[in-house]
């Protein structure tokens, strides 16, 4: 027994294998996502009617919002899209045996559970951190939050930030130094490009967040005055520092999703991606522009009119590379032999709802309009269409695309399609009415509202219950896959009549990337020797 336990500990807790670490990230993200979903349901239940429903304390309500946001951003989307899919797939995409720094990879993951524990403690101690995920002073200052909850949230962010920085360095080194000579950068799979760009954004933006929250920590505990007006500080400085990180952060969340969607749409349209180079440069442009538009979150703080004009124009320019990506996905589908598998359904759902989220983003980019919409439910609807329906749908698309390769087991196709439709209906019923609430002026982060808003709020809360049903159905699908799933061959997503489980299929078909040349699941060291240029690799590109 002790031998079995020690082997288990060595396999999972001391692992240096990128595939096992990727699986750990996905399991961790699944757990955090369920926890964050539970918090979101509490929010929607409180808002299902006017006046007090379940949560009498407004501080508790705001603490739930903070916990929900931080859980979903730092402990669900980032670990899943970057840590999970990135770790598992990147060595396979570049033809390498593992990540460049395997032990660094291990510590990158194991910093996250302590960080999650700190965040949960933060929510449970002295009423929690009722600051929202933005942690603006003076609300997060020592006068408004005198207990340790904000300090614990800051420590949680520090730990998850260090984890992300170490992971980003590992990804960049792996892609630059461990590619097989046959795969030059302009032939790298789009998901590989997405990971590179995301890693660079992390390296450039996270230190700024670390600086801002460290200054806040010293303001709270060591009597400094970075953000204390009484001591000559400026709380607006915190907003500038936070959003210089915060806006690239939203692209850190969505760019890996772009890579996944490009891969799945290409595979299930039976065509190579339309405009590969354009797609790469569009992602690069989005990443660069993301650093010079941060003050569009701050139109209401009293910016100079010329400053507001600049940030409006710069923000609207981001719509250009985003539009290139949307139309390239549509062009990839056009004329293709489309198969509506669960993965493809989620990809098409992503394109549809990301477009809606992008259109409301164009509205909010205008300083004159954002003065009215700032801190209303219009903003909540906008970023949930991009995240709750963008990043999350991309995660499901990637899951259903690669999980037969990862586990070597097939899943129930029918139930997976049912899950897509339940989730699609649920999230739209939840978030589309919030556009109307925002247009009517309902403010965010307040647990009570006038009776006039009751109708749309009730519909929105009903939609959240539908979404929870989809989440439980997903867990059941995973359970069935693990318990009853049939063996998945090397190419689990091909039509059975069109493939044989041999490398001959690679010679006859254009493949998106190298992982399909391997067994399902891949061996711990997938490519012991680097794959050489051959007919197979020529057929890939």
Swiss-Prot record:
Query: Which GO BP terms apply?
Result: electron transport coupled proton transport; mitochondrial electron transport, cytochrome c to oxygen
Q: Which cofactor does it need?
A: heme; Cu cation
Q: Which Pfam families match?
A: COX1
* The protein's annotated pathway: Energy metabolism; oxidative phosphorylation
Annotated residues that bind Cu cation are located at: 247, 296-297
What residues bind Ca(2+), as annotated?
Answer: 46
SS bond partners: none
Provide the function of this protein: Component of the cytochrome c oxidase, the last enzyme in the mitochondrial electron transport chain which drives oxidative phosphorylation. The respiratory chain contains 3 multisubunit complexes succinate dehydrogenase (complex II, CII), ubiquinol-cytochrome c oxidoreductase (cytochrome b-c1 complex, complex III, CIII) and cytochrome c oxidase (complex IV, CIV), that cooperate to transfer electrons derived from NADH and succinate to molecular oxygen, creating an electrochemical gradient over the inner membrane that drives transmembrane transport and the ATP synthase.
Task: Describe its partners and assembly state.
Answer: Component of the cytochrome c oxidase (complex IV, CIV), a multisubunit enzyme composed of a catalytic core of 3 subunits and several supernumerary subunits. The complex exists as a monomer or a dimer and forms supercomplexes (SCs) in the inner mitochondrial membrane with ubiquinol-cytochrome c oxidoreductase (cytochrome b-c1 complex, complex III, CIII).
Q: What is this protein called?
A: Cytochrome c oxidase subunit 1
